[in-house]
Amino acid sequence: LTTCGFDFVLASLHNLAGMEDFYFLDYDRQDVNELLTRYFDEILEMVRWDGFDSLAHLTYPYRYITGDKGIPAQLYPDHGEVIDEILSLLVQNHKALELNTSGLRQKLGQTLPPPDVIRRFRQMGGKYVTIGSDAHRWGDIGAGVETGLSLLLQAGFDRFTIYVGREPVLLPIE
């Protein structure tokens, strides 16, 4: 990654080691809590790797577990300790957390991660937050960004982050 001229590098996790993308899993045959425990443990390992700029769509599996399948799953308190450890490492390593708006236009109906995690990140000293629409179609480019910026303000942020040459640039939320 260091040999290429990227503006920023996202870290994301779509599947657990040795498994398919969360999109393809049969949640009727899975222990959801075990999957989520493994997911957050693997995210923690990725954050320890430190070769990225922004952690993308934390809570990605909830798009399918809660959004598509309607299976209730708790972030706090069930996975709060490891989530806090992830957020703490992001703060310590001056990394951004992405507020991904794709869940707003899907059955989930909320951002990834949800607003309470964004607030927690801010409370822990989080400074850098990127915002992305996770567009896989041209019509979704920028979808939900205005709502996302409003959520950032509510969480205590007055700026969001873009990257130029892998260096963070803070822009005011207007």
Predicted regions and their residues:
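Charged catalytic cores and adjacent phosphate/nucleic-acid-binding surfaces used
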Residues: 17, 70-174
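Extended substrate/RNA-proximal surfaces in nucleic-acid metabolism proteins
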Residues: 1-92
